[in-house]
């Protein structure tokens, strides 16, 4: 990939270097489409076993020893109950985008990193060992029993 030369970069700055620069946009869906999609997503079925899996996953970020997963020394602050809600809704949206009317454990696993990474704070020990929230969440995903 080549970078623009100095003059081209100055043109880019002149065009884009202000906060009021509004890109041209075109409507791709209507408000009605969005509201209908939301309605469908809300109706997507989540089995009790999958709900329990979601709750266990989030609770594991707060009390991993209870689940036999060795990451407690690396978690300063686990995910809040809002993560449980976000993980459920995001898994439903994932199922919707795949044309299914039900959530699978794989839907949950597919979105877990995106939902949880900013909700799990790591300790200084974790940072010293070059571990971050993603590696900790991945260990939970790998070791937490899947229904």
Q: Regions from the language model: what does each represent?
A:
Residues 1-71, 97-101, 105, 126-130, ...:
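Conserved C-terminal "switch" segment of AAA+ ATPases
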Residues 63-147:
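C-terminal engagement/docking regions of AAA+ P-loop ATPases
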């Amino acid at each position: 990939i080549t970078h623009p030369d100095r003059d081209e970069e100055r043109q880019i700055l002149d065009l884009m270097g202000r906060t009021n620069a509004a890109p041209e946009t075109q409507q791709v869906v209507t408000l009605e489409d969005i509201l209908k999609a939301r309605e469908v997503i809300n109706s997507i079925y989540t089995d009790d076993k999958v709900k329990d899996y979601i709750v266990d996953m989030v609770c594991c970020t707060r009390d991993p020893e209870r689940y036999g997963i060795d990451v407690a020394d690396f978690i300063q602050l686990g995910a809040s109950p809002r993560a449980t809600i976000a993980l459920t809704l995001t898994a439903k949206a994932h199922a919707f985008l795949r044309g299914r009317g039900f959530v699978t454990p794989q839907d949950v696993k597919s979105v877990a990193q995106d939902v949880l990474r900013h909700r799990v704070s790591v300790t200084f020990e974790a940072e010293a060992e070059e571990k971050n929230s993603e590696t900790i969440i991945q260990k939970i995903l790998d070791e937490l029993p899947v229904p």
